[in-house]
C-alpha cells in the first residue's frame, strides 16, 4: 500500500514536541561548546532525505552512529567513500557474497544506493560524541525513532524489517507482523555474527518477499553515486 504522505507531513508535529526541541538544543550546544559531534549537522537526517516515506521497502535498524573521524553520514552501517569499511558492514558483505550469486565485495562502505532504492538505514540514536559510543543515548533520539518506526508500520504495507541484535529486536516489537515481514538475526558485529547472522539469508529473503508483493527487488551491490549515473 503506497502512501502520498511525506516524512515532513507525518513528523511535523513530532518535531514540535518539547523532548525533540530539547534533543536538538542539547546537540547544538555541544557543537557550539567545541565538542565534535558526528555526523555533521547537515547529515543527521540523511536517512529521511534519501528514502522518502512513500518509498520505504526495507528497514535496517542500527544503534548509534560511528564515532570515528569522517565515518558517520546519517545512514546506519554506511561510511563515506574513502573511509575503511567497518567490521559489521564487512560481515554484511560476507553474507551477501555467500547468498547472492555474482555479488562481489565493494572496496567502499557507502550505502547511499541502497537508501535510494527504498532501504531506510535508520540508527536509533542519530548523533554521538567523537570517540564516545552511546554518548547521546537517552537524549531523546530513541523516542523520535520509535515514532518513525510506528509511522512506517502505520502508513506502509509489506515492508521488510531486518532486525539484527537484541537492541533492534526490542525496538521492533511494535511492528505489526500481519502487515509487514520481520526477519531477526544476531548483530553482524564480529562479536556475534557467527551466532547466526552468517547464513541468515536475510538479503535474499527480503528480495523474495518484495517480488512476491509486486515490488522491484533491491540491488544489494553498493555503487558510488558517480558509478550509478
Swiss-Prot record:
GO BP term (any one): base-excision repair, AP site formation via deaminated base removal
Protein name: Uracil-DNA glycosylase
Cross-referenced Pfam families: UDG
Enzyme class, spelled out: hydrolase
Role: Excises uracil residues from the DNA which can arise as a result of misincorporation of dUMP residues by DNA polymerase or due to deamination of cytosine.
Keywords of this entry: Cytoplasm, DNA damage, DNA repair, Hydrolase
Gene3D superfamilies in alphabetical order: Uracil-DNA glycosylase-like domain (3.40.470.10)
Subcellular locations according to the entry: Cytoplasm
The protein's Enzyme Commission number: 3.2.2.27
SUPFAM superfamilies listed in its UniProt record: Uracil-DNA glycosylase-like
Catalyzed chemical reaction(s): Hydrolyzes single-stranded DNA or mismatched double-stranded DNA and polynucleotides, releasing free uracil
CDD domains: UDG-F1-like
Residues annotated as catalytic: 64 (proton acceptor)
A GO term from the CC aspect: cytoplasm
SMART domains per UniProt: UDG, UreE_C
Protein family according to the UniProt entry: Belongs to the uracil-DNA glycosylase (UDG) superfamily. UNG family.
Keyword check for Cytoplasm: yes
NCBIfam families: PRK05254.1-1, PRK05254.1-2, PRK05254.1-4, PRK05254.1-5, ung
GO molecular function: uracil DNA N-glycosylase activity
